Every structure is written in structure tokens, then in C-alpha cells.
Amino acid sequence: LVLYADMNNLKIINDRYGHEEGDYSLHTIAEILAEIVQKEQTGDGVVARIGGDEYACALMTEKKKELLLQELYDAFTVRNEQSDKPYNVTVSIGACALEPGDEHSLADALSLADEQLYEVKKLRKKDVAKIPLQA
């Protein structure tokens, strides 16, 4: 499973609350992504910050993509509810699953997850999008 995540409203948080709060938000995203990847992987897994406010995750898991994405959504919701910050930390996520025997590369899956992420951003939703590799 490949996820491409992009933080929502980093510029607004930086402008209103300062860069320390923006950095806090970026660390929060990394922590939540790492917690879920560590908990759900059945093989190797990795979370990487790939630029600015974007993260990529790749993991082997037997969990259905939609369930894993719901766990991420729930984790962000809980963290925001428990936070004393005057803002919520949210991400938009694109996802692509590689099936055993799939001929597509990890780079293909990351590219497709990235395309889906920007579809989500274009629709201005804090949601996840899914795309089959056959796109």
C-alpha cells in the first residue's frame, strides 16, 4: 500500500501562529503516520517526508486500504480533540494498493497516489481518494 499525504493549511498555521507551530504540526503528522505504519505493517514499511508538507508511506499490510485510511482519519481526529492548540492538524491523502504479482512499480503507485491526492485537494476535501493501478 502506498500513501501520499499532504498537510492542509500549513501556510495559514505558520502565518497565524508562527513557524514553531507549523513545525509542531509537521512533527504531529509524521508521528501519526509512523504509528499507523508501525502498527499495521506485516512486512517492511517506511514513512518519509518528501518535501515541504508532503509525506509518502509504503507498507505491506493485510488490512484493506479503506480500513487503514479510516484508522488514519480517526488518529488525526483523536489527536485534534486532545490537543490544546487553536487549530486542527489535517492531511489530504491519496492511496494506491499494489497487489501480489502486480507488474507496476512502487514509483508507479506513488505517482498514482500523488494524482489522487491532488484530486482531493482540488475538491477541497479533507478526505482520501483511491485509484486502481489500471488508470
Predicted regions and their residues:
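Conserved long alpha-helical elements within nucleotide-processing catalytic cores of c-di-GMP signaling
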Residues: L1, N8-E35, A48-G52, A56-C57, ...
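Active-site core of bacterial EAL-family cyclic-dinucleotide phosphodiesterase domains
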Residues: L3, Q134-A135
